[in-house]
Amino acid sequence: MRESGILMPVSSLPGPYGIGCFGKEAFEFVDFLVQAGQKIWQILPLSPTGYGDSPYQSCSAFAGNPYFIDLDTLKEEGLLTAAQLKAEKWGTDPKEVDYGTLYVSRFKVLRTAYAAWRKQCAGLYGCAYYFPDDYYAFTLANEEWLDDYALYMALKAANGMKNWVEWDKPYRLRDRKALAAFAAENEEEIGFWKFVQYKFAAQWQAVKAYANKKDVQILGDIPIYVSADSVDAWVGGALFELDADGGFARVAGCPPDYFSADGQLWGNPLYNWEYHKKTGYAWWVRRVRHALGIYDLLRIDHFRGFDTYWAIPADSTTARTGKWENGPGMELFDALEAALGKLPIIAEDLGELFPSVRKLLADSTFPGMKVLQFAFSGGDSEYLPHNHVKNSVVYPGTHDNTTLTDWWENGASEKEKAAAAAYLHLTGVKPTAKELAAIRTDDVRIALLRAALGSVADRAIIPMYDWLGLGAEAHLNTPGKLGGNWAWRAADGFAAKALAKTIHDECSVYCRV
């Protein structure tokens, strides 16, 4: 069945509190998707943002982002007042997330809400340590990760938010007596972090249930690696490659290529795949099971890393010293499928791929990705629409690409422009510089959107900013750039009925409605 969807990060929704969240704007966006004939809402990872404000560098592979909790809902529950919300600063530009300001204001009001909730519970149950049944149900269902997460965040707060490798040895090495003593002395702080996850889960499940009721599926995203500064790394131990001192032996990255002479040094700890194999990939089963409770479909980032991955000594300053190692391959996905059933996974298979990676993708039967911005650099590219396959997902660009408008005006080379113009019938087959200069940017944008929708690929996902025709201001992420990413927010009223009709009509032409 041919269908289409829209890539729209939760953080990019409009709203009064500095960042998109699970409030009325999320429900209104689902309504917009329905009006536009869309079946998929693709979002970025819902994990807490970490280094560089990235959702791909999170403090937890299981926790949700506290920033997404809707504060108006907490106000309706009697946990916050309008005056308390009005007193805080949420940023100066409603079209951009100010993560620095948000870090201060969000946690301040969430702590206020937590104190009010504790007081509310004490009044209801006559005891300061009795809580609602759904809270106990949530903590019990998620105890495998929640207890460690809450303890980790409390320890992090007590240590000035430093990386756990800088904590005192008893905490760093998880000495039982030291952790038990800390937990006893910091019950309220640990409770705060559980409360945050409790509210996150309740609100997100309400949004997801509403979307599913409207026949809209949520396409989520899980990074292959965890952050070095995370509860997963702190607790994981044998899950990762460790040296004799218990530190990380090697870290993740990419080898040198045309774009980077030194390669990319990501710094994420690498998995000890031999250990995972011995456990039947139990941690991965837990992780994917948890993700399937949050999302309907899963995009797995850096899929090629399950076949072969670049391993770099932890003390290296560049990725040049790394080498290729073999990943778990189909054995991992067979274990996941045996435990969880058929997996609704989309593989991020972009970039140069070894034949073995292509074989893994074929053996898994997961759909891969086709990105049109990569199609026009020369030759018979696999990303050109005539080379697409049915079992794939086509995108004009991903969150790591700029917008179509900015790509044409500032990103594409003259060679790419000429190839795209000819392919999209915007000029003759050999356009002159004058002919290229005469092309309207919006004509290119619409032609690329139609090329994506017209692809044989089963699914077409269009970023919201490309439907809106936005430029560089909406560029979500520039790989390798630290700071200034993940900030774009849509303007109030962006999800207009007229735009929904345009999207519906365009998708109807290509039988995606």
Where do the protein language model's features map onto the residues?
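Surface-exposed amphipathic alpha-helices with a cationic face
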Residues: 34, 204-212, 337, 361-362
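Conserved, well-ordered alpha-helix/loop/beta-strand core segments that scaffold catalytic motifs
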Residues: 193-226
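Outer-envelope exported proteins of Gram-negative bacteria
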Residues: 44, 217-219, 223, 297, ...
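Alpha-amylase-like alpha-glycosidases and glucanotransferases acting on alpha-linked glucans and related
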Residues: 9, 18, 53-197, 201, ...
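Mature N-terminal, pre-catalytic/accessory segment of carbohydrate-active enzymes
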Residues: 1-37
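Structured C-terminal cap/extension of enzyme domains
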Residues: 469-513
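Catalytic domains of carbohydrate-active enzymes, especially glycoside hydrolases
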Residues: 24-49, 293-295, 452
